[in-house]
Structures are given as structure tokens and as C-alpha cells.
Amino acid sequence: MVLKFSVSILWIQLAWVSTQLLEQSPQFLSIQEGENLTVYCNSSSVFSSLQWYRQEPGEGPVLLVTVVTGGEVKKLKRLTFQFGDARKDSSLHITAAQPGDTGLYLCAGGGSQGNLIFGKGTKLSVKPIQNPDPAVYQLRDSKSSDKSVCLFTDFDSQTNVSQSKDSDVYITDKTVLDMRSMDFKSNSAVAWSNKSDFACANAFNNSIIPEDTFFPSPESSCDVKLVEKSFETDTNLNFQNLSVIGFRILLLKVAGFNLLMTLRLWSS
């Protein structure tokens, strides 16, 4: 009798556990540094509490937060945790993700028996933004060796670009280039001179240039060449244009004929 009762209790516990499964989505997530993300945790059953853990490679899970009240919202710096009103779901939102946020995120629901039911986890990978090193590029006119332009780009916003003491060298103020097609911005400045011995290595002498700035060798300067693209007409497009012109002429003739007939009727 006691054995049957114990087996019945065991089956009840197993049935309760089987209905307390947690589903996490997405299972894998890879984003760039600075982006936002949301991880979801759902169940068909009600939990008395819900916990979020983060596990880094080679280490054990670390508790981030515990929520117990339906509709509860907790914030931990850039992390926001929310427990659903029905206590069946939860979400983790990370703002401006950093490479240090990389890891496995686990949600765990607590039942009335005091045990925890874990989800399968969400593996997050945050790729760091690789800022390009500052560089100076020299552009020479292919038709005249006396004309040269230096482009100083990808430098830090704290860098000061000063005018040259040489009256024959002209330097623009620091500007921000918005590379919308590549989704990033870059600081830049331009220097130019008509002097034949003008060198980019000396153009920004009065400015504080980072030590890791790339300077091209005199042999590796870029020749600016004018490339003329040949223009070829499209026969189909030409036919369509001629058709439109023809229809317009026909419309004008019809309108003129109608106007002439109307004037004749009025005059008679």
C-alpha cells in the first residue's frame, strides 16, 4: 500500500514537471556591438518565480535577477527583466550590447515544490566594432605632378587639426563624414598645395597625430585619373520615348480639330 502511494506521488511529480517546460527563443543570437536585443522565455504553466542566469564559457551559471510578482519589471544597468502578468512568460532586454555580454542566458522557473525548471538557453554572441586606424592618403594629379592632396581620416574626435605654418599649404577644418551606405561616421581633414615637394608626412606637422597613423610612402601615392564612361542608348527605351512623343502629337491634333469644329459650329 505504501509502495503504491509512493509511486502515485512520483507520477504526479513527473506529470507536474513535464507540464512546466520552459521554451526560450531565440536559441542563437549574433549581433554587432551597440545593438539592442530581446530574449524570450515562455511556458504553458504558472510559476511562483522566475530567474535569469548568465553562463560564460568554462564557468558555471551566475544569477542575474529573480522576479516573483506578475507584471514586475527590474533593471540592472543595461539589462531589463520583465515577468508577465500571468506569470507564464518573461523577457530579457539588453540595450547597447557589449562584447562582455557574450554568453549563455538561461531562464529558470520556480514551482510550489521549490524546484527549478530550466530552459535550454539562448547563446548570445556580441561582435566588437573594429575601429579603423587613422591614416593619411596622398592623391596626385596624373596630368600635373605639382598638384597634390592629402586626406587625413579615421582619427579620434579629440584630435585637433591645426593650420600649417607654411603659407603655401591649405588645411580644411575637421569634418565628420556620414557614410550612410556603410552605416558609420568618420572624422576627416584635407590638405593641399601646389608645391612640387609637398609631402603628406609634413602636411599635418602642427596637429597632434596618433602614433599609429598610417602614412603612405612617396612611391605609393594614388594617381587621380579621369575615367570617362561610354554612353550607350537603349533601343527599347528610345522606342518608348518616340511612342510617347507620337501620342502627344496625335493628342494635340485631335484637340486642335475639335476646337476648330467647335468654332465653326458657333460661327454658323
UniProtKB/Swiss-Prot annotation:
Disulfide-linked heterodimer with TRBV19*01J2S7*01C*02 beta chain. The TR primarily interacts via its CDR3-beta domain with M/matrix protein 1-derived peptide (GILGFVFTL) displayed by HLA-A*02.01 in a 'peg-notch' recognition mode. The alpha-beta TR associates with the transmembrane signaling CD3 coreceptor proteins to form the TR-CD3 (TCR). Residues 147-235 form the Ig-like C1-type domain. This is M1-specific T cell receptor alpha chain. CDD domains: IgC_TCR_alpha (cd07688), IgV_TCR_alpha (cd04983). Residues 222-243 are annotated as: Connecting peptide. The complementarity-determining region CDR1 confers specificity to the peptide antigen. Assumes a loop structure that makes contact with HLA-A*02.01 and contributes to the stability of the TR through interaction with CDR3-beta loop. The complementarity-determining region CDR2 confers specificity to the peptide antigen. Assumes a loop structure that recognizes the peptide-HLA-A*02-B2M complex. The gene is TRA. Glycans are attached at N36, N42, N160, N194, N205, N241. GO terms for biological process: adaptive immune response; T cell activation involved in immune response. Keywords: Adaptive immunity, Cell membrane, Disulfide bond, Glycoprotein, Immunity, Membrane, Signal, Transmembrane, Transmembrane helix. The keyword Nucleotide-binding does not apply. SUPFAM superfamilies: Immunoglobulin. Expressed in M/matrix protein 1-specific effector and memory CD8-positive T cells readily detectable in the peripheral blood, secondary lymphoid organs and lung (primary site of infection) of IAV infected individuals. Residues 1-19 form the signal peptide. Residues 20-109 are annotated as: T cell receptor alpha variable 27. Residues 129-268 are annotated as: T cell receptor alpha constant. Residues 45-49 are annotated as: CDR1. Residues 107-118 are annotated as: CDR3. GO terms for cellular component: cell surface; T cell receptor complex. It comes from Homo sapiens. Residues 110-128 are annotated as: T cell receptor alpha joining 42. Pfam families: DUF1968, V-set. The alpha chain of TRAV27*01J42*01C*01/TRBV19*01J2S7*01C*02 alpha-beta T cell receptor (TR) clonotype that is specific for HLA-A*02:01-restricted M/matrix protein 1 immunodominant epitope GILGFVFTL of influenza A virus (IAV). Classified as a public TR clonotype, it is preferentially selected in effector memory CD8-positive T cells among multiple HLA-A*02:01 carriers and confers long-lived immunity against IAV infection. Can cross-recognize sporadically emerging IAV variants by molecular mimicry, inducing immunity toward different influenza strains. Disulfide bonds join C41-C107, C150-C200.
